[in-house]
Amino acid sequence: MTETPDLDPEDRKIVTLARSARARNGVPEGAAVRDETGRTYVAGTVALDSLRLSALRTAVAMAVASGAKSLEAAAVVTEAEAASEEDRAAVRDLGGPGTPVLVAGPDGAVRATVSAGCPRSYACLSG
């Protein structure tokens, strides 16, 4: 279960969905995004010989392909310490620079929240 104090229930939901995608598919990362209508899109890392996408970029692509106009929030469950610049850029492209990106460990605990517009991995971290 995703247990992070002071986490909004809707944010807790996307962290839980991201964690489930990671575990269910046995991939390095799971991600989920929530669009402007509250719909969620969940994905895992794509690692094919001809196509490589992070879980977060895949979730953003799924949102775009489904007609989302904006994002309210994004979450990634990973062993990495921060969301990559490329991942934040994808979130920023659809949601804008103020869109929060929650970074959680494999246990589901949110380690940090960073703005999609943050210029560097650690510059705008909180949590």
Segments from the language model and where they lie:
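Short, glycine-rich nucleotide/cofactor-binding loops
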Residues: 45-52, 80
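N-terminal first-folded block
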Residues: 9-44, 48
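Short glycine/serine/threonine-rich phosphate/pyrophosphate-binding segments
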Residues: 41, 56, 84
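A short, polar/charged loop-to-alpha-helix boundary motif
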Residues: 49-62
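Residue-level detector of alpha-helical recognition elements and their boundaries
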Residues: 33, 52-53, 74, 106
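C-terminal binding/interaction regions
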Residues: 2-24, 66-127
